[in-house]
């Protein structure tokens, strides 16, 4: 297992995935984001982030949601409902430019 230079808890399982930042050759650089896993299919997970924006015209706050596709390595195995930390990497496919780095908690147990 290699050190990726980011302060996250490394996975306990091993994997043979080339696109794993811990066991493969994928480098992580750029943004680090946190969100909830909404859907998992194959090696891809859909991460939903909830953003709160201030609207000056109405002097109120508005909730917005954004969805990102992230690579889900076999050693991490994030499931729907998990709160995860994702990191930006090179484009893995047409829509995936992020990889899941760690599972922080579950939907009912936010940390």
From Swiss-Prot:
InterPro entries xrefs: NA-bd_OB-fold, Ribosomal_uS17, Ribosomal_uS17_arc/euk, Ribosomal_uS17_archaeal, Ribosomal_uS17_CS
Coiled-coil blocks: none
Superkingdom of origin organism: Archaea
Organism this protein belongs to: Archaeoglobus fulgidus (strain ATCC 49558 / DSM 4304 / JCM 9628 / NBRC 100126 / VC-16)
GO BP term (any one): translation
Family: Belongs to the universal ribosomal protein uS17 family.
Keywords: Ribonucleoprotein, Ribosomal protein, RNA-binding, rRNA-binding
Subunit composition and interactions: Part of the 30S ribosomal subunit.
Function: One of the primary rRNA binding proteins, it binds specifically to the 5'-end of 16S ribosomal RNA.
NCBIfam families: PRK08572.1 (NF006345), uS17_arch (TIGR03630)
A Pfam match: Ribosomal_S17
Any one GO MF annotation of this record: rRNA binding
A GO term from the CC aspect: cytosolic small ribosomal subunit
The keyword Thylakoid belongs to this UniProt entry's keyword annotation: no
Name under which the protein is recorded: Small ribosomal subunit protein uS17
Alphabetized PANTHER family for the sequence: 40S RIBOSOMAL PROTEIN S11 FAMILY MEMBER, 40S RIBOSOMAL PROTEIN S11-RELATED
